[in-house]
């Protein structure tokens, strides 16, 4: 006799746009609830805290204010504290105060020109996450010129907020992907296997995207930072969008991409950015000191061939394409 209780319901898929990118969410719910409207409403509020491209957001108000801001929403304090933690742990490689440098190099909304070194030196005098003070209800500038770029933290934090909200609704098996990063909880019940996430090949172009690796994940967050499509060409030379806050110039390393796996997505997000800034050699050394992190790094060897490095914790779950 056919037993209906052994069947698994079809997953519910929700997708949309947020933070200048797209999101895709898959989850299983015996009640068959579609949470798209609630998720969109939640992301609108999160954007009102952390979206640099919304001139009315809290982070934008901080950037245009000379002294700082009081928090109106509950979504800015947590990523600010995480940024502070990784700023110190990475020796300043992750630093959200690079915003004026991002704009100077034309990665913001302005014109693409190469700034001269004197302008860079001038901007560097007010770059540094130690130039802000975070309290439970406010963010204060120690220098009126300080500005924050949440590009290396916002999407990961947004994915965490959505995943936490879904879990609060009793969802135990879900995959949240926001702008290529996200969190995998439980299993893909349709096939009773871990969730599978693809990692882009660094040779991908915007028009032709293909995967270099597939990773099987359960109860783990993931993010990949790379300069796949995001670079500027000035006078025939390509510059990566990853700014080194120590030099003020785009980071020049052999690293092609950094995929990081952690307990939460905001942690994975900030460390992936930090690894792109510091390069694969320093990243490998730092990973030895941080057993809570796993990573898959792709980089160019001296002969121009692509190499990979994986931490032991993630290696059994990675399938590399030839």
Residue ranges and their predicted role:
Residues 1-322:
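Mature catalytic core of soluble alpha/beta enzymes
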């Amino acid at each position: 006799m056919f037993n209906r209780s052994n069947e698994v319901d079809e997953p519910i898929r929700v997708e949309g746009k947020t933070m200048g990118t797209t999101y895709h969410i898959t989850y299983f719910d015996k009640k068959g609830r579609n949470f798209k409207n609630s998720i969109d409403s939640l992301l609108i509020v999160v954007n009102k805290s952390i979206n640099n491209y919304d001139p009315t957001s809290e982070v934008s108000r901080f950037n245009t204010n000379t002294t700082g801001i009081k928090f109106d929403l509950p979504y800015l304090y947590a990523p600010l504290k995480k940024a502070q933690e990784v700023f110190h742990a990475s020796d300043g490689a992750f630093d959200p105060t690079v915003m004026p440098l991002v704009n100077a190099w034309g990665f913001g909304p302005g014109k693409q020109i190469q700034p001269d070194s004197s302008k860079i030196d001038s901007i560097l005098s007010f770059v540094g996450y130690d130039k802000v003070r975070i309290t439970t209800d406010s963010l204060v500038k120690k220098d009126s010129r300080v500005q924050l770029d949440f590009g290396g933290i916002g999407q990961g934090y947004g994915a965490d907020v959505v995943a936490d909200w879904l879990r609060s609704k009793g969802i135990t098996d879900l995959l949240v992907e926001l702008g290529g990063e996200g969190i995998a909880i439980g299993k893909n019940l349709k096939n009773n296997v871990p969730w599978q996430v693809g990692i882009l090949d660094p040779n991908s172009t915007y028009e032709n995207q293909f995967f270099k690796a597939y990773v099987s994940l359960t109860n783990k967050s993931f993010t990949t930072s790379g300069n796949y499509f995001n670079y500027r060409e000035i006078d025939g030379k390509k510059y990566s969008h990853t700014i080194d806050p120590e030099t003020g110039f785009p980071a020049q390393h052999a690293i092609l991409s950094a995929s990081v796996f952690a307990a939460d997505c905001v942690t994975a997000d900030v460390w992936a950015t930090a690894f792109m800034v510091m390069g694969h050699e320093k990243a490998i050394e730092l990973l030895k000191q941080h057993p809570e992190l796993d990573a898959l790094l792709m980089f160019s060897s001296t002969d121009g061939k692509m190499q990979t490095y994986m931490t032991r914790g993630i290696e059994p779950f990675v399938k590399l394409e030839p």
